């Protein structure tokens, strides 16, 4: 399920929830992006909160998780403010622009 974040008729970001399968069917992951000029306004914190609340209320989910690059503390703060506790660090998890980066794992449960 994917949602557009719209401000004054313009798409400025997006958020998506991707359900797990089989033994993970009670879980989902959330991912998001927001145009840089809209950073620091609480827009994404509100979007993550509203979308995860909606998912917990309307689907048989018990856990929604998200991963952020370790070098993106603003995105980690979005998750923390939306009620996602930090669960751990995934070392050398992603290869971005030729560099290995750690990912930080956050999750909200019912």
Language-model-derived ranges and their functions:
Residues 2-110:
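Acyl-donor (CoA/ACP) binding surface of acyl/acetyltransferases
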């Amino acid at each position: 399920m994917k949602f557009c974040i719209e401000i004054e008729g313009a798409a400025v970001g997006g958020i998506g929830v991707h359900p797990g399968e089989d033994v993970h069917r009670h879980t989902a992951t959330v991912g998001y992006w927001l145009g840089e000029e809209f950073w620091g306004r609480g827009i994404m914190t509100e979007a993550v909160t509203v979308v995860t609340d909606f998912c917990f209320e309307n689907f048989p989910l018990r856990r929604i998780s998200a991963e952020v690059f370790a070098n993106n503390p603003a995105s980690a703060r979005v998750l923390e403010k939306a009620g996602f506790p930090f669960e751990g660090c995934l070392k050398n998890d992603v290869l971005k622009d030729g560099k290995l980066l750690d990912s930080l794992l956050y999750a909200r449960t019912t």
